């Protein structure tokens, strides 16, 4: 029996995020602020555009990293096998850019980092894996209610350091992507 490097996109994402995490520790947070965190900054700064994508690779600490990567490693390989690396990379990039832009324009005093939006996109996409034309899986409805409902509740009533917006937007991107890619 041999070890197989399955799911190159997902594993690449996990290892890039690990490198960003280690770099953040080595630089005492400077790399996250510079590249792996999105916040309102000058549109003339080229790193503003890098951060729109890069913020999904950065994490605030090991617990944040391990939590997100656990879900990505659990759900990602199945999604990569079903939809292909190119399409899944598109979902990751779309989630990153949309959450980054929303944060940039609507939450000017807030900096976000982490792959939580990608995790929520994967969760909602996964519920479409058994989708048949003309049907909406009950699992999708339940997952949407449980995961997105919790984020809406937390966003309204719980004051913490978590970007519920990124979770909700990631979930929406995943749901729409799962629906649009279901038969392709």
Task: Name each model feature, range by range.
Residues 1-184:
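A detector for small-residue-rich transmembrane helices and their helix-helix packing motifs
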């Amino acid at each position: 029996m041999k070890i197989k490097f399955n799911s190159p996109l997902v594993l690449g994402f996990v290892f890039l995020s690990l490198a960003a995490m280690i770099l953040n520790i080595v630089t005492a947070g400077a790399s996250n602020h510079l590249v792996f965190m999105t916040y309102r900054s000058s549109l003339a700064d080229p790193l503003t555009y890098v951060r729109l994508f890069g913020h999904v690779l950065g994490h605030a600490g090991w617990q944040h990293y391990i939590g997100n990567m656990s879900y990505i490693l659990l759900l990602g390989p199945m999604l990569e096998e079903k939809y292909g690396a190119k399409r899944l990379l598109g979902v990751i990039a779309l989630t990153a850019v949309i959450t980054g832009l929303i944060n940039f324009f609507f939450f000017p005093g807030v900096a976000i980092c982490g792959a939580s939006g990608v995790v929520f996109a994967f969760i909602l996409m996964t519920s479409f894996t058994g989708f048949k034309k003309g049907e909406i899986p009950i699992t999708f409805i339940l997952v949407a209610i449980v995961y997105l409902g919790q984020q809406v509740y937390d966003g309204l009533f719980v004051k913490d350091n978590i970007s519920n917006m990124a979770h909700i937007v990631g979930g929406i991107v995943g749901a729409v992507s799962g629906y649009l890619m279901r038969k392709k």
